[in-house]
Amino acid sequence: MGRGRVQLKRIENKINRQVTFSKRRAGLMKKAHEISVLCDAEVALVVFSHKGKLFEYSTDSCMEKILERYERYSYAERQLIAPESDSNTNWSMEYNRLKAKIELLERNQRHYLGEDLQAMSPKELQNLEQQLDTALKHIRSRKNQLMYDSINELQRKEKAIQEQNSMLSKQIKERENVLRAQQEQWDEQNHGHNMPPPPPPQQHQIQHPYMLSHQPSPFLNMGGLYQEEDQMAMRRNDLDLSLEPVYNCNLGCFAA
């Protein structure tokens, strides 16, 4: 006898229902992975348990991209099928879409922070680990790039400061050389053109009135000769005549 068709219905026993859910969920995840690998298809699988726990599978961990693509496709189809649909319905669908996207982002954020990991399968944990490793590599690469750019900027500023210091030092040396050359030129001019010493100040001597009265005052006659010698000779003759009797008297006294 052949095996009859098993009727599908809800399992009443909670333990059996939980075991069956775990087995079927694992098989479903395996089938989704197989079809994505064998057929090169983009697969997104979302499963909620009866307790509200979320289980998902996505090709290459791109659940958000697949869901956004699905939303665009379904929205375009709805626009083609019912172009005159009510605007309220469109707003309601848009609200539900954004709400689901926000919930997905919040859940991924909790996973990135290491929260709510109990409901994740080993495959999901592996995908999360790969995502974190990739993100960590990007972060380290960006940090290293910023540090490298900062070092290059500091080196550029240092080089500019060194060039400025060199230019200032060169200008200072050139200025010192110019001043030194000017000083040497001034020294050579002073040594080469020595001025005679200034004359000493004149001393005012007090002279006797007799000397002043008898000081010769030469004058020029018509012939261009001075009469100083004639006047001096006349004065000596007068002096000899006046002193001769005195000398004779004294000599007579000594003879007696």
From Swiss-Prot:
| UniProt keyword annotations, A-Z | Activator, Coiled coil, Developmental protein, Differentiation, DNA-binding, Flowering, Nucleus, Transcription, Transcription regulation
Keyword Nucleus present in the record's keywords: the answer is yes
Q: Which SUPFAM superfamilies match?
A: SRF-like
Self-association state and partner proteins as the record states: Homodimer capable of binding to CArG-box sequences.
Alphabetized CDD domains for the sequence: MADS_MEF2_like
Question: What upregulates or represses it?
Answer: By cold shock (e.g. from 22/17 to 16/12 degrees Celsius in light/night respectively).
Keyword check for Endoplasmic reticulum: no
- Describe the location of the MADS-box domain by residue ranges: 1-61
A GO cellular component annotation in the UniProt record: nucleus
Q: Which Gene3D superfamilies match?
A: Transcription factor, MADS-box
Q: Cellular location of this protein?
A: Nucleus
A Pfam family: K-box
What protein does this entry describe? Floral homeotic protein APETALA 1 A
Supply the PROSITE patterns for this chain: K_BOX (PS51297), MADS_BOX_1 (PS00350), MADS_BOX_2 (PS50066)
User: Which BP terms in the Gene Ontology apply to this protein?
Assistant: cell differentiation; flower development; positive regulation of transcription by RNA polymerase II
Q: Where is each K-box domain found?
A: 88-178
